[in-house]
Amino acid sequence: MSKVTFKVTLTSDPRLPYKVLSVPESTPFTAVLKFAAEEFKVPAATSAIITNDGIGINPAQTAGNVFLKHGSDLRIIPRDRVGSS
């Protein structure tokens, strides 16, 4: 089975840390999002992955589809809950 590799950058950190993830191309992208969020210690439920152009990626597809459509350079954005205590 073929693998795809993503470079995921954490945009909320001024140092712009990144992780390189290699997954089988049939992996659901929701799993990639969850794993990337765990690696950066941000909540997966309130995070989104976007392209460098700022285009949001629908996680309801395979990692292979995302790679073909958007390439390997992605960003993760943790969405903070404003006003919650």
Swiss-Prot record:
Compartments where located: Nucleus; Cytoplasm
Propeptide section residues: 84-85
SUPFAM superfamilies: Ubiquitin-like
Modifications after synthesis and translation: UFM1 precursor is cleaved by UFSP1, promoting its maturation: processing of the C-terminal Ser-Cys dipeptide is required to expose its C-terminal conserved Gly residue.
Keyword Nucleus annotated: yes
Record-listed cross-link Glycyl lysine isopeptide (Gly-Lys) (interchain with K-? in acceptor proteins), residues: G83
Function text: Ubiquitin-like modifier which can be covalently attached via an isopeptide bond to lysine residues of substrate proteins as a monomer or a lysine-linked polymer. The so-called ufmylation, requires the UFM1-activating E1 enzyme UBA5, the UFM1-conjugating E2 enzyme UFC1, and the UFM1-ligase E3 enzyme UFL1. Ufmylation is involved in various processes, such as ribosome recycling, response to DNA damage, transcription or reticulophagy (also called ER-phagy) induced in response to endoplasmic reticulum stress.
Oligomer status and interactors: Interacts with UBA5. Interacts with UFC1.
Protein name per the record: Ubiquitin-fold modifier 1
